């Protein structure tokens, strides 16, 4: 395709048209633009403007391109019901002259007889020339990017704990707060407790599951709430009156202080409960009721009911007859200590770990335990809000691994303890799939958690695609096949990956791919009815159902897989926006642009993966195109050979040694490999000693 030196990308944002020029019942937002591109030609010695191409009808706030040539004129006509209202004429050369280098520029285009149009323009170079109609290169924002130039971090909204209609989120309280359930002070330097997003009730993390009353700010009326009302009939309203508190007092709902000198809040005449004026309508009808005792009683009854229903008759008889007392002395004292609350330290756990290995390992001797002193820190491979990933060497073995270092305080502050254990579980499970990064061992210090994983020195696909802009179809198909095998393995084990992207697909020394970073993974054990609800992922790869706040399943991974395939084939993202709002709007509403350089089979595969209905998306059972492995894009693929890693890779990364880090970004590898110490000793002291019990693990199935 021939190339032109200059091109102009335009986006019409809005029009300012005087009211007297608008037809009856029409506003400026009702006007529709029509674009004519005219060229100057010589006819019998006279210059005339001739329109050689069809009229374009671009949408507002959608990008479109046109090549710039000498004498070419752009005519924009704003119409209402096919009737012209105002028009503007401008030389394309004048438009690009106002652009600032390669940056996006906003300009006003004057219209006749009056008014103006706000447009966003950008000067492009090496665009298709005039041999191609303007409408052929008309694009939406999905084709407005210059290519993949940056690494994009994942986002995760705060985890919401829904209890009786309350939406509790871990919260950092800048001022002293008391728990509205147990009335105790909420200690801590980070996120000391949970606060409901609807009614602002504040509780300890340990108390949030004990809340028994329905959230007054929620419209929900769950079965549990109805059952609770039927059982306890708790509906005793308070008798509040304005009160002058003579000493510092805290609200029994939101937990914060009642400020002021006079009439700071309300107090119940019967039970002396205090609250802000603004919290009165949110106070539960629990006058004279001890919520903590009532909650304990309710949960005790609930536990007793479940225990009786679930225990087999012989087990129930053992409890009733007291026969279990015969075995009281058979439980080793060391094992009993595991169930006692004690101050945790890394050193004290070593003996317990070895003892547990003997018990569960069949007495064949303890599995070797690893700690930070066993490794030399060599280079930084990557960084994030969680901490770092470093290249390390196992001392005396000449073995190299990738060590992921997670800050304990950051994990606790973001309420991500459960996610850390899920990541550990998936890494252990990865030994059963050749396309997942394996765990070598995990351990901890007082400040950090460590995952030691196999070192994939081929680098990630983001690094390689930045070198050559895009992959050919054969190479893309190879990577896609191995990714499909990996995803289907995870889905078979009821795991949603949720963070598939170029950065997380790494190459080993032979050129085979492996998925890494399972910090966003979700297992069925912590999902509602097999569905997840957390808003998380990398913005460019997030599926429409996540953006809409709907419950979702494994289909989100196939949407991300479609974005990944598009980036490999085209060399840029399928959806674009200047900010997250524009990007998400593009994902929800726009159709990706498929260039002519990709095959029909690839375009058909991408279209099926970009199905906004998750049930019929390619990869899901209800997809009308059938199973993903039988799609025409994968015609001729021997899936058995792929599953066994028997297909030779089309590309082998250049690796000089086992410790070579040349396939990783210099921005990271040039940094000094060191852990950032936590200097705040009070912060370390506030960490729950039992938050990361039994985290240490050595994988007996690890294979290099």
Curated annotation (Swiss-Prot):
It is an enzyme of class 2 (transferase). It catalyses: L-seryl-[protein] + ATP = O-phospho-L-seryl-[protein] + ADP + H(+); L-threonyl-[protein] + ATP = O-phospho-L-threonyl-[protein] + ADP + H(+). InterPro entries: AGC-kinase_C (IPR000961), C1-like_sf (IPR046349), C2_domain_sf (IPR035892), DAG/PE-bd (IPR020454), Kinase-like_dom_sf (IPR011009), PE/DAG-bd (IPR002219), Pkinase_C (IPR017892), Prot_kin_PKC_delta (IPR014376). Disruption phenotype: Up-regulation of nlp-29 is severely impaired in the hyp7 and vulva epidermal cells following fungal infection by D.coniospora or physical injury. One of its GO terms (molecular function) is protein serine/threonine kinase activity. Changing residue 544 to S: In k501; normal up-regulation of nlp-29 upon D.coniospora infection or physical injury. SMART domains: C1, S_TK_X, S_TKc. Residues 375-634 form the Protein kinase domain. The keyword Nucleotide-binding applies. GO terms for biological process: antibacterial innate immune response; defense response to fungus; intracellular signal transduction; peptidyl-serine phosphorylation; positive regulation of antimicrobial peptide production; positive regulation of axon regeneration; positive regulation of gene expression; positive regulation of MAPK cascade. Residues 635-704 form the AGC-kinase C-terminal domain. The modification Phosphothreonine is found at residues 89, 139, 324. It comes from the Eukaryota. The active site is at 499 (proton acceptor). Belongs to the protein kinase superfamily. AGC Ser/Thr protein kinase family. PKC subfamily. Diacylglycerol (DAG)-dependent serine/threonine-protein kinase that phosphorylates a range of cellular proteins. Phosphorylates mlk-1, a component of the JNK pathway. Involved in axon regeneration after injury probably by activating the JNK pathway. Plays a role in resistance to fungal infection and in wound healing by promoting expression of antimicrobial peptide nlp-29 in the epidermis downstream of gpa-12 and plc-3 and upstream of tir-1-p38-like pathway. This is Protein kinase C-like 1. It comes from Caenorhabditis elegans. The gene is tpa-1.
């Amino acid at each position: 395709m021939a190339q032109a030196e200059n091109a102009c990308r335009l986006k019409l944002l809005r029009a300012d048209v005087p009211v007297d020029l608008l037809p009856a019942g029409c506003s400026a937002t009702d006007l529709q633009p029509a674009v004519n591109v005219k060229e100057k030609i010589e006819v019998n010695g006279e210059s005339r403007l001739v329109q050689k191409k069809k009229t374009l009808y671009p949408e507002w706030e959608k990008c479109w391109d046109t090549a710039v040539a000498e004498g070419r004129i752009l005519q924009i006509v704003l119409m209402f019901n096919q009737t012209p209202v105002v028009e503007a004429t401008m030389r394309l050369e004048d438009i690009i002259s106002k652009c600032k280098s390669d940056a996006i520029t906003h300009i006003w285009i004057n219209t006749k007889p009056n008014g103006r149009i706000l447009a966003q323009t950008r000067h492009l170079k090496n665009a298709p020339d005039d041999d191609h109609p303007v409408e052929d290169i008309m694009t939406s924002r999905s084709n407005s990017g210059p290519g993949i130039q940056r690494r994009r971090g994942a986002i995760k909204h705060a985890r919401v704990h829904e209890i009786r209609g309350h939406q509790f989120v871990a919260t950092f309280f800048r001022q002293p707060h008391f728990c509205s359930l147990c009335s105790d002070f909420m200690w801590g330097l980070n996120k000391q407790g949970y606060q409901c997003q609807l009614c602002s009730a504040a509780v300890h993390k340990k108390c949030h599951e004990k809340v028994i009353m329905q959230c007054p700010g929620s419209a929900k009326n769950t079965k549990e709430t109805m059952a609770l009302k039927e059982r306890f009939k708790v509906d005793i309203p308070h008798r509040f009156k304005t009160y002058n508190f003579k000493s510092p007092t805290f609200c029994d709902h939101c937990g914060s202080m009642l400020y002021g000198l006079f009439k700071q809040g309300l107090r119940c005449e019967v039970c002396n409960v205090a609250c802000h004026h603004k919290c009165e309508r949110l106070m539960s009808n629990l006058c004279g009721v001890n919520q903590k005792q009532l909650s304990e009683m309710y949960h005790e009854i609930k536990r007793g009911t479940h225990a009786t229903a679930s225990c087999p008759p012989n087990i129930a008889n053992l409890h009733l007859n007291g026969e279990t007392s015969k075995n009281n002395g058979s439980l080793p004292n060391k094992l009993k200590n595991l169930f006692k609350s004690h101050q945790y330290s890394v050193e004290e756990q070593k003996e317990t770990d070895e003892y547990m290995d003997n018990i569960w390992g069949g007495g064949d001797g303890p599995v070797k335990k690893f700690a930070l002193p066993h490794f030399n820190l060599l280079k930084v491979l990557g960084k994030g809000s969680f901490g770092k990933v470093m290249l390390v060497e196992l001392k005396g073995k000449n073995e190299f691994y990738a060590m992921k270092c997670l800050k304990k305080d950051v994990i606790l502050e973001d309420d991500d303890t459960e996610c850390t254990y899920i990541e550990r579980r998936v890494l252990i499970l990865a030994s059963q799939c050749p396309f997942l990064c394996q765990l070598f061992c995990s351990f901890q210090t007082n400040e950090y958690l460590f995952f030691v994983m196999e070192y994939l020195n081929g680098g990630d696909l983001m690094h390689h695609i930045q070198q050559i802009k895009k992959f050919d179809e054969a190479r893309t198909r190879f990577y896609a096949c191995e990714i499909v095998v990996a995803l289907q393995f995870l889905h078979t084990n009821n795991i949603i990956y949720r963070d598939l992207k170029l950065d997380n697909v790494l190459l080993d020394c032979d050129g085979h791919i492996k998925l890494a970073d399972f910090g966003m993974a979700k297992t069925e054990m912590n999902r509602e009815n097999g569905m997840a609800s957390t808003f998380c992922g990398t913005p460019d790869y997030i599926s429409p159902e996540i953006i809409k706040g709907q419950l979702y399943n494994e289909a989100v991974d196939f949407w991300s897989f479609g974005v990944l395939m598009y980036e490999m084939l085209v060399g840029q993202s399928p959806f674009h926006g200047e900010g997250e709002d524009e990007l998400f709007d593009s994902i929800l509403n726009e159709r990706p642009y498929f260039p002519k350089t990709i095959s029909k089979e690839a375009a058909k595969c991408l279209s099926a993966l970009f199905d906004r209905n998750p049930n019929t998306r390619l990869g899901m059972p209800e997809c009308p195109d059938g199973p993903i492995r039988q799609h025409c894009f994968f015609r001729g693929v021997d899936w058995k050979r792929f599953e066994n890693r028997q297909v030779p890779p089309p590309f082998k990364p250049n690796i000089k040694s086992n410790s070579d880090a040349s396939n990783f970004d210099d921005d990271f590898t040039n940094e000094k490999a060191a852990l950032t110490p936590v200097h705040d000793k009070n912060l370390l002291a506030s960490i729950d000693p039992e938050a990361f019990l039994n985290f240490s693990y050595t994988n007996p199935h690890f294979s290099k």
